[in-house]
Amino acid sequence: MTQLTQEAKVVTTPQAVFIGEDTSNFLRAEHAEAGTSRAYEEHARQRRRATPFGASEQNWRRRDKFFEYLRTCAIDSTRARCMTEVFQATEGQPQAIRIARGVARTLAEIPVFIDDDDLFAGNVTGRPMASHIYPELMPDYYTSEAVDWDAVRTQPSPVIITPEDLALLTSIAPYWRGKTIGDRWNELRRADDEALNRHCLYFSYNMLAGIGHVIANIPLVLQRGLAGLREEATRARKKEATARKPDPDRLAFYDSVIISLDGVVRYAQRHAEECGRLAASAGDPTRRLQLERMAEACRRVPEHPPCDTFEALQSALFVLYGLAAESSQISICPGRVDQWLAPFVEHDLATGTPPEAIIELLEAVICKLAHWWTFTGREAAIIDTGNNLCTFTIGGSHADGSDATTVVTEMVLRAYNHMRMAHPPLALRVHKGTPDHVWEAAVRCISNGCGMPSFMNDEVMVSALQDLGFSAEDAHNYADVGCVEMGSTGTSLGPVSIGFINLAKCLELALNDGRCALSKDQLGPRTGRLAEHESFESVRRAYERQLAFAVENFNHSVSALEQAHAELRPVPLLSALTDNAIREGRDLIRGSSKYRYAGIEGIGFAEVADSLTAIKHLVFDEQAVTAEELYDQIQADFPDERLRQRLINRAPKYGNDEDTADAMAAWVCERFVQEVKSHRDYWNSEYSAGAWSIALAMTLGFGVGALPNGRRASQTLTEGIRPASGCDRNGPTSCLKSVARIDHRLFQNGSIFNMTFTPEMLDGDANRRKFSQLLRTFFVMGGFQLQFNVVDAAVLREAKAHPERHRGLIVRVAGYCAYFVNETSHVQDQIIERTCNRAWTGTY
């Protein structure tokens, strides 16, 4: 078979290529011979008849096993042991080489796990669903002193650790003390940084989890293979070694790249051997053929360029698993899947492969990556639940503005619709030229309760990235690298999720002379109590001072953490998969990426906007309540319920197409971005601002006292830029108009807008057309992102009471989806309380 490279032409899919909703009729007429097609259609109908949503029976069996594995997520200490032994044996050697040897040894010793229903080889660890441990970051995070393992075993998403694994982690912890990222950070950061984190003014711990929120440069691997990259690194090393004054750091970098690439190749070869062994003993002829195909692919990729769709996907999986062994951070993403996969799919379709066979492979990849789970310590259940956020991006436009839809775009949507899994996330880029059939397929997927895709507006994000310094070509090549933050394949390294600022806490300090309302500790500058301000502008100035205090201290904290990474934690494998690193002889963490910027996210936009509006409207404009009275009420967490209801119901609220409240929300966003942009990080890189929160809107909300919008102390904050729950009362159109008043181009790191509709609202073609038009109108008005829950609150309450009946119920938590029954009770309640749209217009 002719070998394909990324120079192959990506054929744009014409409209109405796909015939009917039944995926057995998913045919590309110009590629299919009539007799073969009819035979395959009958075969597809037979093997899909027993599955609820159209997935192949084999993939559906694998999905069923996933839910069993989900109850036994485990800790795998293999990597921790390998990394420790390598570091102990290589004292004094360059850090990059030590990291590379540790990763290579891990990939050489992880047990090979292949499920009986797997169509692809590879896994993050040697167990069905388990997490690596990364002692070089913060080893005590995993010991009995730091984690109540008995509690973790009984949480909604239980985590299992064997006595042997726990004993090993405990035994290696002393070696790492004083040598880790966490230790170095503690030496560099300010004395009060821990207190400001603990009081929920900000959350600056993200990079303790390693380097992530990046795009694995799959197109580069498919074009050249790891052997091609190794050859380039070898040539560069030889050139450096023969220079008049060889640079030892560059030589060490090249050595670390070669070691890392060889480690991934050996990892694939081990799977080829195991697949061959299993094939030889397989009793079922069909399974034997599958295993032989897997073995053949593992012998070729990712060392060499793939020959077909199957090998391209297998190569991508091995690269992702290799990167998981190098760095623990979530959101190592495959980028624009429909772009890099299209040449292989087009080739296979042209040579007689039925479209259903391609969709079956995509289903299998979705299921494989759903097993990528990362233990993030004690807070996992309330911060991110271990979701790895290996986001797929599809759709979008080219640099010339033309549509980038390929034959793969709708195939991916249909595969997600078939599998109905919460992970991996799926983002659809849309623009003015997005074909109707793509909109229709995406809306149908949403209407079925998948929670995916999320929708992202090219016109806004391309402009925002160009403002950040991206070329037009690179900006048009953006992809989601997690919840909603953006990167460009092979050219950018964030860290785009460096941490979070709690805007609601800033307001609390502004109203309380810089003191925490809960602990009474003095945290921020003294800006006076609410009753001491004689004008609304004085209140706003106090808020601005507290915001500036928070961002300045946060900047120092995360810059110290960046410095710790630069000194101790190179990423040679990830560096090898970029455009510049091998050419420059410099690791990504040392600044070799074409674009480098750090993302700071704000949390609590709606609470701050509505609280400031309430103060202005009820205290200073109408004088319906005195500043002293309001101050006393929020300090005491609203003993007067009647006053709290006045604040909730009489003051204008963001989300209702009301000028005063919406203008305040726009100001809160603009002021946050201005403050973020006034700082630079350790690398003197520009910050980009975002409005999203993973699940930290709940976590950071615990540390915020009562607010003037009527929110009680320690309640959750609102994620992203959506209006506060229950405050958008005039229907979805008014809500969308309010959100569109914000200048979304300011959020170069993305913003999240969650909406909830009942299933009846999207039932039938007419309602789905209304829904699609609503989305398009929002994007024409300048909105950036939309994502949806399509579920009734009554169903959620039933699922909370009887989780055993609803194991597959998917909900949007923040920028990611999750299985509702696996979330904590607090998260479940927050989702239930969100505004649910039951009508297209009017109060409800």
Predicted regions and their residues:
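Extended non-globular scaffold/tether segments
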Residues: 255-266, 271
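Core nucleic-acid recognition elements
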Residues: 1
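A conserved hydrophobic secondary-structure block that centers on an alpha-helix together
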Residues: 278-286
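Extended, non-transmembrane alpha-helical coiled-coils
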Residues: 266, 270-273, 277, 293-296
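Conserved catalytic cores of very large enzyme subunits
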Residues: 4-254, 286, 290-844
